[in-house]
């Protein structure tokens, strides 16, 4: 899991 991947997922969810 990468921080960039998490940020992108969070932005997509938000």
From Swiss-Prot:
InterPro entries: Mastoparan. Keywords: Amidation, Antibiotic, Antimicrobial, Fungicide, G-protein coupled receptor impairing toxin, Immunity, Innate immunity, Mast cell degranulation, Membrane, Secreted, Target cell membrane, Target membrane, Toxin. It is found in: Secreted; Target cell membrane. One of its GO terms (molecular function) is toxin activity. GO terms for biological process: defense response to bacterium; defense response to fungus; innate immune response; killing of cells of another organism. Expressed by the venom gland. The modification Leucine amide is found at residue 14. One of its GO terms (cellular component) is extracellular region. Pfam families: Mastoparan (PF08249). The keyword Mitochondrion does not apply. Antimicrobial peptide with moderate activity on Gram-positive (S.mutans, and S.aureus), and Gram-negative bacteria (S.enterica), as well as on fungi (C.albicans, C.glabrata, and C.neoformans). Also acts as a mast cell degranulating peptide. Its mast cell degranulation activity may be related to the activation of G-protein coupled receptors in mast cells as well as interaction with other proteins located in cell endosomal membranes in the mast cells. Activates G proteins that couple to phospholipase C. Does not cause hemolysis to human erythrocytes. Belongs to the MCD family. Mastoparan subfamily. This is Mastoparan-X. It comes from Vespa xanthoptera (Japanese yellow hornet). The lineage of its organism: Eukaryota, Metazoa, Ecdysozoa, Arthropoda, Hexapoda.
